[in-house]
């Protein structure tokens, strides 16, 4: 199973099991969609644009890291919801941390996706001597 498919499985689990994490569910769903679309866009253009990989790499990696961080936070929150009664302070903190990530970090995925799929000539257009 690909990592993207694993994230998708977690999103489905959130959608079916977790009505108490609506923002995390919504933000991770959106971020996954942005990651998938950016990946398809980049792979669809890379053979015709030799500069694309260099131009998009930083923002694409930031997109990947942001989405994967959200995925791991979601997995942690799902486990924490099951175990809250064992240690309410510890597992409650896990849930709050995941909600924070959803509210403050996951929304950045959209900006990274936009930047990663921008025209490579905007990044690579300067000649070496212009630096």
Language-model regions, residue ranges each:
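C-terminal amphipathic alpha-helical interaction region
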Residues: 4-131
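Gly/Pro-rich active-site capping loops and adjacent beta-alpha segments
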Residues: 1
